[in-house]
Amino acid sequence: MRKELESVYKRAVDVWGVESQMNMMTEEIGELLQAISKYRRSYNKSDQVQQEAYEHLCEETADVENMINQFRYILDDKTIDMYKEQKLERTLQKIIKSENEKIEKNSNTTRES
């Protein structure tokens, strides 16, 4: 992360406080959930409505990401990274399992034909 961004995240927490930023995180997560819902409802709408929903989803994602980066300052970066690695490894194992199941299903379907 660029040093100037780290400075902004730290200053936000220092100026507004941990409790305020935790409240802001819940607000931003709620807005992201709404944006996801609106985006999913836009699938069968006009291109313009889809684009607006997409842009709003990107904006709300950025807001949550900025709050997460503030939480990295509030909490412990190393602990967050440790859990992140564990979760990614678990996700990778699930992906591999799903891929293997698809391969097996396809080979069984091919044999039955």
Which functions belong to the PLM regions below?
Residues M1-S113:
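Flexible "arm" and connector segments at domain edges
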